[in-house]
């Protein structure tokens, strides 16, 4: 079992129960899933770019990504409905905890000029979204084999009802929020 999951069960639940005066352990917010999304707009011209992006995402997440297709045609971007334009992965369970641990302890500290992530990126319901500009911050990605530096979106979905509860949950995991 992931160390972060054990830490959640042993320390975080008790800490948040005390902080928010929950009457039941089931009221304590938990992380439900982590979604990784990579938009590859250039894939319209070159299908190989999307394959490489999907390969990078599979390496980062440990799971095969789903190829996302355009929902509607946009003439300005030369996109037709159904064109493959990105990929996404939804992590739950053991893989989710492993990814979160690697994100907090290894990947984010490797970002150049890292001062912390914004504490304002909550959606109003306790879910947190952030963007990473380079996929090479993850140690699984071999820098020499990367054809192009791509960014990805990371969404952490929690069962928290408010942003305050969601922020407290992530802060309990030592999530590096900007001061």
UniProtKB/Swiss-Prot annotation:
> What SUPFAM superfamilies would the database entry show?
RL5-like (SSF55282)
Q: Which InterPro entries match?
A: Ribosomal_uL5 (IPR002132), Ribosomal_uL5_bac-type (IPR020930), Ribosomal_uL5_C (IPR031309), Ribosomal_uL5_CS (IPR020929), Ribosomal_uL5_dom_sf (IPR022803), Ribosomal_uL5_N (IPR031310)
Q: Which Gene3D superfamilies match?
A: 3.30.1440.10
One Gene Ontology molecular-function label? rRNA binding
Pfam families reported in the protein's UniProt record: Ribosomal_L5 (PF00281), Ribosomal_L5_C (PF00673)
GO terms classed as biological process: translation
Q: So which residues are the signal peptide here?
A: none
According to the UniProt record, one GO cellular component term is:
ribonucleoprotein complex
Keywords attached to this Swiss-Prot or TrEMBL record, sorted alphabetically, are:
Ribonucleoprotein, Ribosomal protein, RNA-binding, rRNA-binding, tRNA-binding
Quaternary structure?
A: Part of the 50S ribosomal subunit; part of the 5S rRNA/L5/L18/L25 subcomplex. Contacts the 5S rRNA and the P site tRNA. Forms a bridge to the 30S subunit in the 70S ribosome.
Family indicated by similarity:
Belongs to the universal ribosomal protein uL5 family.
Looking up HAMAP family in the UniProt record yields:
Ribosomal_uL5_B
What is the stated purpose of this protein? This is one of the proteins that bind and probably mediate the attachment of the 5S RNA into the large ribosomal subunit, where it forms part of the central protuberance. In the 70S ribosome it contacts protein S13 of the 30S subunit (bridge B1b), connecting the 2 subunits; this bridge is implicated in subunit movement. Contacts the P site tRNA; the 5S rRNA and some of its associated proteins might help stabilize positioning of ribosome-bound tRNAs.
Quote the PANTHER family the UniProt record gives.
Answer: 60S RIBOSOMAL PROTEIN L11-RELATED
- What protein name is recorded for this chain? Large ribosomal subunit protein uL5
């Amino acid at each position: 079992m992931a160390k972060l999951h054990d830490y959640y069960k042993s320390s975080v639940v008790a800490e948040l129960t005390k902080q928010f005066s929950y009457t039941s352990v089931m009221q304590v917010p938990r992380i439900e899933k982590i979604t990784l999304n990579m938009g590859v707009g250039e894939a319209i011209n070159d299908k190989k770019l999307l394959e490489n992006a999907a390969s990078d995402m599979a390496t980062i997440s440990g799971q095969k990504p789903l190829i996302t297709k355009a929902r509607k045609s946009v003439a300005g971007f030369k996109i037709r409905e159904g064109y493959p334009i990105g990929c996404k992965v939804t992590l739950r369970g053991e893989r989710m905890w492993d990814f979160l641990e690697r994100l907090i302890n290894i990947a984010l500290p490797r970002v150049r000029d890292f001062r912390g992530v914004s504490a304002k990126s909550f959606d109003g319901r306790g879910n947190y979204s952030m963007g990473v500009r380079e996929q090479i911050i993850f140690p699984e990605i071999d820098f020499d084999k990367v054809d192009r530096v791509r960014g990805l979106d990371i969404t952490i979905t929690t069962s928290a009802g408010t942003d305050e509860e969601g922020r407290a949950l992530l802060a309990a995991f030592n999530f590096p929020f900007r001061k």
